[in-house]
Design a protein with these regions (language model features):
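Ligand-binding pockets and gating/stacking loops
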Residues: 1-152
Length: 152
């Protein structure tokens, strides 16, 4: 059984994590404390119940934020480099994969992309990322063109 949930810890309080202005104050005072509390509580609860190994937790965004600060003390949309957190689901804890350059502008080591994240999730769910599916005309389509990250 695969259950999936998505959430926004900021609810209807405004800009969510889209911090085009006042980035640092919003993150420090409003957004990161409840995120930290919720994420750590989820991992600990699953660990205590013996469910962490069978539950994959993925925390990510649809894009990163610019390395440079804009005129409104915020950061704008930026797909060049961003962070993803994996926990549980057979992932070995306490590891870092990849590294950005010194200004956070682009990957410097072990670059990966969305297709690799998809492949990693499929792998954790026991689904072969290279599995072929067929369209209505019986044309083969790869489920994913990425490779699972070596996190297991």
């Amino acid at each position: 059984t695969v259950y999936c949930a998505a959430g926004d810890l900021n609810g209807s309080k405004g800009s969510h994590f889209d911090t085009h202005a006042d980035n640092f104050n919003k993150l420090k005072n409003n957004m990161l404390p409840p995120f930290d509390q919720a994420a750590s509580a989820l991992v600990e609860d699953l660990r205590e119940r013996g469910r962490l190994d069978e539950t994959l937790i993925v925390m990510l965004t649809d894009f990163g934020r610019t390395p440079q600060i804009n005129k409104g003390a915020g950061r704008d949309h930026f797909p060049g480099a961003y962070s993803v957190v994996f926990a549980g689901g057979g992932i070995r804890g306490g590891q870092v994969y990849g590294k950005s350059n010194s200004i956070g502008f682009e990957p410097a080591e072990q670059a990966c992309g969305p297709s690799d994240l998809h492949a990693t999730i499929f792998h954790a769910l026991g689904i072969d990322p290279e599995h072929m599916i067929y369209d209505a005309d019986n044309r083969p389509l790869p489920l994913c063109d990425g490779k699972p990250l070596p996190l297991f």
